[in-house]
């Protein structure tokens, strides 16, 4: 018995699998992995000052009742350099910003601040990336909105750009 329609079954299976593959590639995905610390208190830490003339940073510095940003950066990070003017704009808008410098030397942090400005109230040095990992940070730069009680309210992954400034101001103001 001749069954020519059986030849179409493998073709239909291949077409179906190909269609699924194309759909999977065409649908945009959220490829950012957010911290499991969202909605939780900052982990305990006390970091030494990242450079002379700028105070050190601990988790208790961020429990004074004032919401703020916590920026994770590095002097060697190109996107960190690109976001520097927008951090200055946030500071000019009255947003308090603390920072953690990742795997950096004091002289490199000082040179970074001299070239790009210092929007930070305090900068802790996390040379081992221990605090960065406790925060659930996956890279630099990253910025967190911290409530006045030390709760992590929001995480911005990647560099801050002009379009992010109003949103971050709004999130800090909403935390007041």
Summary of predicted features, one role per range:
Residues 1-48, 176:
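N-terminal targeting signals for export/organelle localization
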Residues 69-70, 97, 143:
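Hydrophobic beta-strand anchors of alpha/beta hydrolase catalytic cores
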Residues 45-69:
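A short beta-strand-turn-helix
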Residues 81-117, 127-133:
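Structural microenvironment flanking redox-active thiols in thiol-disulfide oxidoreductases
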Residues 71-77:
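Aromatic-flanked redox-active Cys/Sec active sites in thiol-based oxidoreductases
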Residues 114-119, 126-176:
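Thiol/disulfide oxidoreductase modules built on the thioredoxin-like
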Residues 43, 73, 98:
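Conserved Rossmann-like nucleotide-binding pocket used by diverse enzymes
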């Amino acid at each position: 018995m001749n069954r020519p329609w059986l030849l179409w079954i493998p073709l239909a299976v291949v077409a179906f699998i190909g269609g699924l593959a194309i759909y999977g590639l065409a649908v945009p995905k959220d490829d950012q992995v957010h911290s499991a610390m969202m909605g939780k208190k900052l982990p305990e830490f006390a970091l030494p000052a990242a450079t002379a003339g700028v105070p050190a940073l601990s988790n208790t510095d961020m429990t004074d009742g004032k919401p703020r940003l916590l920026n994770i950066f590095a002097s060697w990070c190109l996107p960190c350099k690109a976001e520097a003017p927008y951090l200055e704009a946030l500071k000019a808008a009255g947003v308090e910003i603390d920072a953690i410098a990742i795997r950096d030397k004091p002289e490199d942090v000082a040179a970074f601040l001299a070239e790009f400005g210092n929007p930070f109230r305090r900068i802790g040095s996390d040379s081992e990336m221990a605090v960065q990992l406790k925060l659930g940070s996956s890279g630099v730069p990253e910025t967190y909105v911290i409530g006045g009680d030390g709760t992590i309210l929001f995480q911005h992954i990647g560099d801050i750009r002009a379009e992010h400034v109003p949103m971050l101001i709004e999130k800090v103001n909403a935390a007041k």
